C-alpha cells in the first residue's frame, strides 16, 4: 500500500512540469506584447524575458528531482 502511495507522490511531483510550461508561455507572451508596445526597449526586455524563462525553468527542474527522491531514496518501512 505504501509503495502505491510512493508512486502517486512521484507522479504528483511531475505535474509541476505542466505549471512550468504555462509559466514559460506567460513569460514569452508578455515579452512579445511588451516589444510590440515599445520596440525601442527590445534588448532590455529580451534580457528580462531570458531571466524569467530561466527562473521558471529552474523551478521546473525541481520536479524530476523530487520524483527521483520519492521513488529511489525514500525507503518504505
Curated annotation (Swiss-Prot):
Coiled coil: none annotated. F-type ATPases have 2 components, CF(1) - the catalytic core - and CF(0) - the membrane proton channel. CF(1) has five subunits: alpha(3), beta(3), gamma(1), delta(1), epsilon(1). CF(0) has three main subunits: a, b and c. It is found in: Mitochondrion membrane. PANTHER family: ATP SYNTHASE LIPID-BINDING PROTEIN, MITOCHONDRIAL, ATP SYNTHASE SUBUNIT 9, MITOCHONDRIAL. This protein is one of the chains of the nonenzymatic membrane component (F0) of mitochondrial ATPase. One of its GO terms (biological process) is proton motive force-driven ATP synthesis. GO terms for cellular component: mitochondrial membrane; proton-transporting ATP synthase complex; proton-transporting two-sector ATPase complex, proton-transporting domain. This is ATP synthase subunit 9, mitochondrial. Disulfide bonds: none annotated. It comes from Petunia sp. It is a multi-pass membrane protein. The gene is ATP9.
Amino acid at each position: 500500500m505504501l509503495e502505491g502511495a510512493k508512486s502517486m507522490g512521484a507522479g504528483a511531483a511531475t505535474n509541476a512540469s505542466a505549471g512550468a510550461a504555462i509559466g514559460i508561455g506567460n513569460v514569452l507572451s508578455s515579452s512579445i506584447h511588451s516589444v510590440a508596445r515599445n520596440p525601442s526597449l527590445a534588448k532590455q526586455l529580451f534580457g528580462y524575458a531570458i531571466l524569467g524563462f530561466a527562473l521558471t525553468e529552474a523551478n521546473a527542474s525541481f520536479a524530476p528531482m523530487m520524483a527521483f527522491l520519492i521513488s529511489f531514496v525514500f525507503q518504505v518501512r
